[in-house]
């Protein structure tokens, strides 16, 4: 194959602010019942702007093609988490029932615009300018129940169960400008839309014993 020389020069500018926040509050219904609510928020946005000059030369350093490529890209991401916990104690020492719920939303969206200018002897296989938009996120619901109770002296029984319902999605849409027809065309691939759902179940059983200065704990866990 004939040797060629590719030169690419340009500049890029990035910017990415972030925001964080959290809040938690509790309400003591009475001496045996406690309700706790919490929330956490994280949000970020990255922007990227680039300008490049691309030049191809043959083995004799004669120009083959030239063009300028400019791109603007934005990524938005983060998470929102909300939790609710209910704790119920009894008059029996160290006996405790906890019921918990968690919700989490994690978006991750991207979009970019790319154009070619000052094109000389270059024919890309797809039209330009191009728009690419991806919208993705994961939603997760988690419910959990935990129960702890003493049995005999220095012995404790623990049981619990958890259920997670998780939904993930990702949709990508692409358009390119057809210069000959003067229209935007959809060039989205058939496998660019994604959906996935998960149901996760788990349960555990534990038993602990203390003997003077020593302790023993055994347990089993089942996940599905």
Question: Language-model segments: what does each one mean?
Answer:
Residues 1-224:
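Primarily recognizes Gram-negative and organellar outer-membrane beta-barrels
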């Amino acid at each position: 194959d004939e040797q060629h020389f590719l030169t690419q020069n340009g500049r890029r500018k990035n910017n990415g602010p972030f925001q964080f926040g959290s809040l938690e509050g509790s309400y003591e219904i009475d001496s045996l019942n406690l309700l706790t609510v919490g929330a956490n928020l994280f949000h970020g946005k990255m922007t990227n702007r680039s300008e490049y000059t691309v030049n191809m030369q043959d083995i004799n350093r004669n120009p083959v093609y030239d063009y300028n490529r400019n791109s603007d890209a934005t990524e938005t991401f983060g998470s929102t988490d909300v939790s609710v916990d209910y704790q119920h104690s009894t008059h029996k020492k160290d006996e405790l029932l906890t019921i918990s719920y968690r919700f989490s939303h994690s978006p991750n969206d991207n979009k970019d615009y790319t154009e070619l200018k000052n094109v000389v002897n270059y024919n890309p296989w797809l039209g330009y300018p191009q728009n690419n938009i991806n919208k993705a996120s994961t939603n997760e619901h988690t419910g959990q129940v935990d129960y702890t109770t003493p049995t005999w002296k220095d012995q404790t029984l623990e049981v619990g169960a958890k259920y997670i319902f998780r939904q993930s999605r990702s949709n990508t849409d692409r358009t390119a400008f057809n210069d000959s027809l003067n229209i935007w065309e959809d060039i989205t691939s058939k496998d660019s839309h994604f959906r996935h759902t998960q149901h996760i179940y788990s349960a555990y059983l534990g038993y602990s014993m203390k003997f003077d200065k020593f302790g023993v704990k055994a347990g089993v866990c089942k996940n599905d």
